[in-house]
C-alpha cells in the first residue's frame, strides 16, 4: 500500500510539472501571436466604429445641406 501511494504521488508530481511546462509554453506562444491579432482586432473595432459614426452623421449632413428634412 505504501509503495502504491508513493508511485501515485510520483505520477501526480510529474503530471503537475508536465502541465505547468505546457501552460508556460502555451502562454509564450499566445503572447507571440497576440501582438499580430491585437492589431487586427483594433483595426476591426476602428472600422466598425467609424462606420457607425458615418451612418449617423451622413444623413444629418445630407439633410442640412439639401434642407429637405
Curated annotation (Swiss-Prot):
| Signal peptide limits | 1-22
- Pfam families recorded: Antimicrobial_1 (PF08018), FSAP_sig_propep (PF03032)
Q: Which GO terms describe its cellular component?
A: extracellular region
Q: Which GO terms describe its biological process?
A: defense response to bacterium; defense response to fungus; killing of cells of another organism
Do the record's keywords include Repeat?
Answer: no
The UniProt entry lists the main location of this chain as: secreted
Tissue specificity, please?
Expressed by the skin glands.
Cysteine disulfide links: 63-69
Q: Where's it found, cell-wise? A: Secreted
Q: What does this protein do?
A: Antimicrobial peptide. Active against Gram-positive bacteria R.rhodochrous X15 and B.licheniformis X39 and against Gram-negative bacterium E.coli ATCC 25922. Has antifungal activity against a slime mold isolate. Has weak hemolytic activity against human erythrocytes.
Name the family: Belongs to the frog skin active peptide (FSAP) family. Brevinin subfamily.
Protein name per the record: Brevinin-1CG1
| Provenance organism | Amolops chunganensis (Chungan torrent frog)
Amino acid at each position: 500500500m505504501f509503495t502504491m501511494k508513493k508511485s501515485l504521488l510520483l505520477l501526480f508530481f510529474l503530471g503537475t510539472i508536465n502541465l505547468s511546462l505546457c501552460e508556460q509554453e502555451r502562454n509564450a506562444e499566445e503572447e507571440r501571436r497576440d501582438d499580430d491579432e491585437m492589431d487586427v482586432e483594433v483595426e476591426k473595432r476602428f472600422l466598425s466604429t467609424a462606420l457607425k459614426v458615418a451612418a449617423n452623421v451622413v444623413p444629418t449632413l445630407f439633410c442640412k445641406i439639401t434642407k429637405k428634412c
